Amino acid sequence: GVFFTARYFVPFLRTGKPGRAASAPGKFAVISSQMGSSTRSGTSAPIYRASKAAATNLARSLALELAPDGIAVGAYHPGWVQTDMGGAEAAITVEESAEGLLQRFAALGPATSGVFETYQGEEMPF
């Protein structure tokens, strides 16, 4: 998913789009999970963990590749969210997660490109 999305959209970020100059900085966000972090080992959901580790590391690689083009790439953990997957016991609401992620996207730039952050802006280890 992340790879094919990037493969499709990166050319548009590099060349600009109607109404945006090609020199305007582009941004690309990857939603991952702390369960893909190397510090969160465990035996549950190994395929999910592997897919999130891959997504996070792809974001880091894209950040390095796209930096010369002025495109920032961020990887984000949305939190443990009250969804069908997270359940009613999860720590935060969808709205809280979305609000935090929108703040992270707005702040995404060269200084935070290639960084894995929580929806609250805390840096996470890969």
Label the model's feature ranges.
Residues 11, 36-37, 80-83, 87:
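Active-site micro-motifs of SAM-dependent methyltransferase domains
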Residues 43-46, 85, 89:
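Conserved short-loop catalytic and cofactor-binding motifs
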Residues 75-78, 87-126:
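C-terminal helical subdomain
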